[in-house]
Amino acid sequence: MYAIIRTGGKQYKVQAGDVVQVDKLEQALGAEFEINEVLMVGGESTAVGQPLVKGAKVTVVVTKQAKTRKEIVFKKKRRQGYRKFATHKQEFTELFVKAISFDGKTAKSDEAATVVDVKAVRAEKAQARVAARKERAANKGPAEVVKKAAKKVAKKKVAKKAVKKTVKKATKTGAKKKAAKKTSKKA
């Protein structure tokens, strides 16, 4: 059995066990509620509403409240110097279709809804990154730190010596050119 539901001004075809992304709904995470705006129910027999099917309802569970990937909005008018750049993230709600009921018949899902708290997942990942950084810093012993510092100093000294050599060469060649000019003027 399937149903066509309307939410947020859009229509979605759903079956029991489907996961659907709809525009943001003001429902708590893990909340179970019914959608009564059913436009059509199909399957063994089809019922089309005018505009809604009476007695039909779809039971859903909120599994995620999040934002979509960042979309780039770029506007330009050529030869006018007009350029606008913006980004946008659309909020959405992910729904798990638990059951579709109509005319005494009910199509239920065998699966259970898995609720994902996006904020908690992000916080866990951030904590894991911080812990990994601390562990890496703790694993570096004082000997490694000293070696690294010594390498930096050695590189700097080598670089200073190379710079001094190039400066000396440049001044010698410059002095030779000046001397050559003076001798050519005298002659």
Curated annotation (Swiss-Prot):
It comes from the Bacteria. HAMAP family: Ribosomal_bL21. Keywords: Ribonucleoprotein, Ribosomal protein, RNA-binding, rRNA-binding. NCBIfam families: L21 (TIGR00061). Part of the 50S ribosomal subunit. Contacts protein L20. GO terms for molecular function: rRNA binding; structural constituent of ribosome. This is Large ribosomal subunit protein bL21. PANTHER family: 50S RIBOSOMAL PROTEIN L21, LARGE RIBOSOMAL SUBUNIT PROTEIN BL21M. This protein binds to 23S rRNA in the presence of protein L20. InterPro entries: bL21-like, bL21-like_sf, Ribosomal_bL21. Residues 157-187 are annotated as: Disordered. Belongs to the bacterial ribosomal protein bL21 family. One of its GO terms (cellular component) is cytoplasm. GO terms for biological process: translation. It holds the Pfam family Ribosomal_L21p. Transmembrane segments: none annotated.
